[in-house]
Amino acid sequence: MRPPLTGSGGGFSGGRGRGGYSGGRGDGGFSGGRGGGGRGGGRGFSDRGGRGRGRGPPRGGARGGRGPAGRGGMKGGSKVIVEPHRHAGVFIAKGKEDALVTKNLVPGEAVYNEKRISVQNEDGTKTEYRVWNPFRSKLAAAILGGVDNIWIKPGAKVLYLGAASGTTVSHVSDLVGPEGCVYAVEFSHRSGRDLVNMAKKRTNVIPIIEDARHPAKYRMLVGMVDVIFSDVAQPDQARILALNASYFLKSGGHFVISIKANCIDSTVPAEAVFQTEVKKLQQEQFKPAEQVTLEPFERDHACVVGGYRMPKKPKAATAA
């Protein structure tokens, strides 16, 4: 067990041990668990090394407010107000700190140890929300970056390429709700295990452990979808998206792609890479509509959103 951090300047507070270490010269020292713990050494985390606190931090974890033990809730306790975001299915929890949240499809269950917030409704029932961390999810970073439309909304059918262990997929599953469906494709078996375990509890997630470069291999599992979200971080990711779109994305559907400049070409500036990728997408019947940077959450990443095989707009008759 990793010793929890104390907030008072010097070192770590130990677990439940007897004495712990008192710091040497450079280490702000560990302060002991239930008893001892000397003073932290000279140049630790704070200038003076600080004094080790006897008993470790309060039970609610290092920072959590008044939430359940171990994983504190939002700061501000019962004063959290949840408001709908302009993207349907996304909410903002306003407490001491504002956070992006989604309504938990499986109340009582966390997927990746994220914070959960329970809000009392007027009729006495409770609704549980899960905090959506933009540092762990490109889609949340794009929403906070001000993307105009993510096209993923309640009832939508989504094909998610590069699902990893299902962190973002779980929030997309919350977003589309019981009427929607998320086909989550992931090639790595290790991440796939977590993905499959998450999907056991979320009936609207269909995990597919397969290479997104070969959509023909899973064509029997996936129906036509409204949106493809792609986060594959491969040099040929535009091609991977186009292949999957040709099989599964309906005409007039939409795509959201997260582009990591470094994994395409690390020798040129990120902006140039994004420009080239957008051109590639345009050649494949995609119509990119907007691009947002994922700074400060991800470095040299951009998110591009647009339509696929969009119907031609009828030309308005010119007035004589």
From Swiss-Prot:
SUPFAM superfamilies the record matches: S-adenosyl-L-methionine-dependent methyltransferases
Distribution of this protein across tissues and organs: Expressed in roots and flowers. Expressed in leaves and stems. Expression levels decrease during aging.
Main location: nucleus
Amino acid composition bias (Gly residues), ranges on this chain: 7-44, 57-76
Keyword RNA-binding on entry: yes
E.C. number: 2.1.1.-
Catalysis performed (reactions): a ribonucleotide in rRNA + S-adenosyl-L-methionine = a 2'-O-methylribonucleotide in rRNA + S-adenosyl-L-homocysteine + H(+); L-glutaminyl-[histone H2A] + S-adenosyl-L-methionine = N(5)-methyl-L-glutaminyl-[histone H2A] + S-adenosyl-L-homocysteine + H(+)
GO BP term, example: methylation
Record keywords, A-Z: Methylation, Methyltransferase, Nucleus, Plant defense, Ribonucleoprotein, RNA-binding, rRNA processing, S-adenosyl-L-methionine, Transferase
Residue span of region Disordered: 1-79
Sites where the protein binds S-adenosyl-L-methionine: T167, T168, E186, F187, D211, A212, D231, V232, A233, Q234
CC annotations in GO: cytosol; mediator complex; nucleolus; ribonucleoprotein complex
Processing after translation: Methylated by PRMT11 and PRMT12.
Coiled coil: none
Subcellular location, record wording: Nucleus, Nucleolus
Induction / repression: Repressed by abscisic acid (ABA).
GO molecular function, one term: RNA binding
Note from the entry: Baeckstroem et al identified FIB2 in a Mediator complex pull-down assay and suggested that FIB2 could be a plant specific component of the Mediator complex. However, no experimental evidence has been brought so far to confirm this hypothesis.
Record PANTHER family: RRNA 2'-O-METHYLTRANSFERASE FIBRILLARIN 1-RELATED, RRNA 2-O-METHYLTRANSFERASE FIBRILLARIN
Family per record: Belongs to the methyltransferase superfamily. Fibrillarin family.
Subunit structure: Component of box C/D small nucleolar ribonucleoprotein (snoRNP) particles. Interacts with groundnut rosette virus long-distance movement protein; this interaction is required for virus long-distance movement protein transiting through host Cajal body and nucleolus, relocalization of fibrillarin to the cytoplasm, and in presence of viral RNA, leads to the formation of stable RNPs. Interacts (via GAR domain) with the hordeivirus TGB1 movement protein (via the first 82 amino acid residues). Interacts with PRMT11 and PRMT12. Interacts with MED19A.
Domain comment quoted from the record: The N-terminal DMA/Gly-rich region (also called GAR domain) is rich in Gly and Arg and functions in nucleolar targeting. The central (138-179) and C-terminal (225-281) part of the protein exhibit cooperative RNA-binding activities.
Annotated protein name in UniProt: rRNA 2'-O-methyltransferase fibrillarin 2
Name of the coding gene: FIB2
